[in-house]
Amino acid sequence: MLDKHGRKINYLRVSVTDRCNLRCVYCMPPEGIVKKEHDNIMRYEEIFKVVKSASLLGVNKIRFTGGEPLILKDIDKLIYNTSKINSIKDIAMTTNAILLEDMVEELKKAGLKRVNISLDSLKEDRFKSITRGGDINKVFKSIEKSLSIGMKPIKINTVIMKGINDDEIDDFMNLTKKYPISVRFIELMPIGEGRKLYKDGYISSEEIISKHSDLIPVETDKSSTALLYKFKESKENIGFISPMSCKFCSGCNRVRLTSEGTLKPCLHSEKEVDLKNYVDSSQALLSKINETIYNKPLEHHMIEEKESKSKKMMYQIGG
């Protein structure tokens, strides 16, 4: 469907849980989070009702996120049932891949088409530091397993932080020359725990691109959040997601369902609608989703204000 600004909204990002098995420095506090009561998070059945309703309004792309979505007990069932909705053409997932190796075959059979893997360092000790305890070897094994069963292309999402991992930019770029792996460099955002790192840690996409004159621009769909490039010898693209230096609001095609059941028409807006109040009535749910999508804000003002208006943390929204 179209929002009131004429944008086609066909993409729903679904945060299935706010829990995670890592504690990345820009996302989650070191002590973790207080576990929410069961009544305060969406059940599997409620999530599916929202997905089904959204599909009736023209949504044909679903991405499951977290927290860490592989923690959800019924994630394979949710993917399978979503894949049976005829109008849904693409089902993807963003994961830290710690648990992916043992699950990826079943997830693919269930209908998962693609995975984005959050990976902010290729160095074992640094990865452990950024994630506060993660085992990078589990991630590498998950990538190898995913490639071996034909889950291609895999996209790696890397949040670049000055003085923390910006010395690995070339190493990440070179992955695209060796493997059918895309890399997405994401600008650090002043949201949640990222606020603490932003002043000293922010580095713009433009600064990175300017240092790599051999990058070749690739034609990009208007709704894409990334500017795409590649090297002459690349197997896949290198993307730059630049919410701070070059917002992509004019072509935005997405809304977000949080793990608490609120529908956010904009990642960086404080506006959201609690859908848990409507899931028992299919018509009321459909109407409320329709209304929320139609009233999606024209744009965010995070570039000007240097801060997200969203009160939620990234692990609640799913990015």
From Swiss-Prot:
It holds the Pfam family Fer4_12. It is an enzyme of class 4 (lyase). Residues 4-227 form the Radical SAM core domain. The keyword Acetylation does not apply. HAMAP family: MoaA_B (MF_01225_B). Belongs to the radical SAM superfamily. MoaA family. This is GTP 3',8-cyclase. It comes from Clostridium botulinum (strain Langeland / NCTC 10281 / Type F). The lineage of its organism: Bacteria, Bacillati, Bacillota, Clostridia, Eubacteriales. The gene is moaA.
